[in-house]
Amino acid sequence: METKSYDYTEDEYQEAFEKVKRDYVGQAQSEKSPRLIFAAGQPASGKSALPKKIMKDYPNVSFVSIDMDKYRMYHPRLKEIEDDNADFVQSTNKFSIRIEKEMLEYCLENKISFIHIGTMRIYEYLKQVVIDRAKAQGFDIEVYALAVSNEQSKVSALLREQEQRRTMRNFYRKTSESFIDEADEGFKRSVG
């Protein structure tokens, strides 16, 4: 089944990006020795709890949280996606990936400490675009990883989807088994 395209104008995108920056960058400022911390784990492993631990470990650092899944709610066609009962993840993917990349770029360019929350599924991209550049700009880089078995990731993803369907109407995250398998392999390559 083909996913409907929920296109938006460049002006609408820029307005959404500015709102994301306002909501997530807040008072964070450029630092002489900024930190990049990856909060990594397979899908539904519980990695979203890692930023709280990181901030506790670094109470004097003002981190920007970069989490592609959080940016989905800023999509300019969110109401239409909901009204159409469309696949939330597929319908917002291109948008949230673009926001994520621009937030990474913004933090790197401005030497702002940030936590990148994700599966580290595509390590090659992270290494070339983020890690190498962050090192060159003086970022201290760390990884906080939460590893679970592939089976646990699949069960947790299904439970999360069911809970989100119940509580978030059409804004649930459905994660395919093939994506979990791909993320598990990428995570092992990246962290293992």
State each model region's role.
Residues K135-A157:
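Conserved phosphate-donor/acceptor-positioning beta-strand/loop module used by diverse small-molecule
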Residues L50:
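Hydrophobic positions on the alpha1 helix immediately C-terminal to the Walker A/P-loop
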Residues M1-Q29:
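N-terminal pre-Walker A segment at the start of P-loop NTPase domains
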Residues G26-P34, C107-L108:
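Phosphate-binding P-loop
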Residues K47:
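Conserved lysine of the Walker
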Residues D57, V155-G192:
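Conserved GTP-binding G-domain of TRAFAC-class P-loop NTPases and closely related GTPase folds
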Residues Q42-P43:
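The conserved Walker
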Residues N60-I131:
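Conserved nucleotide-sensing/catalytic segment adjacent to the nucleotide-binding pocket
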